[in-house]
Amino acid sequence: MKLYCHVDRVLTELRAVGKDDDEPLSASELTPFDQLHYHGTESVDLAVERAKISADSSVLEIGSGLGGPARHIAATAGARVTALELQRDQNALASKLTARCALSEKVKHICGDFLTY
C-alpha cells in the first residue's frame, strides 16, 4: 500500500535552498522537509523527554517515512534508532538522507511490515 507519493520532493526542496544531491547535511537542516507528522520536531522532543530517551536508549520507530524523527532522536538524544518503513521508496531515500547526515551508525533503516518484523 503506497500512502505517500513524490518522496523525491525533499531533494527538490533541498536543491531550491542550494544543497547539492550528495552534499553532507545535518539533521536540523532536513527538519523543514522530512517531518511527515504534526508539530515537527517539537512533538518528537516532547516524546523524547517523556520517554526519557537518552544515549543509552534503543528506539523502534514504526512507520518512519523519510526518517526525520529517527534522525532527530539520534542527533539530539544520541539514541540508537531502528526505523521501520513499509514503503520502499521512502525507506531508500531515508537511508540516503541519514548517510548524508553521517548518522548511519545510529539509525538503521529497515523496509518491512511491523506485523511481520
Feature names for model-found ranges:
Residues G18-D20, L30, D45, P69-A70:
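Short, flexible segments with low predicted structural confidence
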Residues M1-G18:
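N-terminal auxiliary segments of SAM/dcSAM-dependent transferases
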Residues E23-P24:
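Conserved adenylate-forming
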Residues S58-T116:
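Class I SAM-dependent methyltransferase SAM/SAH-binding core
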Residues S28-L30, A55, A79-V81:
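A short, structure-level motif marking secondary-structure boundaries and short turns
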Residues D20, H37-A55:
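Conserved alpha-helix/loop element of class I SAM-dependent methyltransferases that forms part
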Residues S28-Y38:
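Class I SAM-dependent methyltransferase Rossmann-like catalytic core
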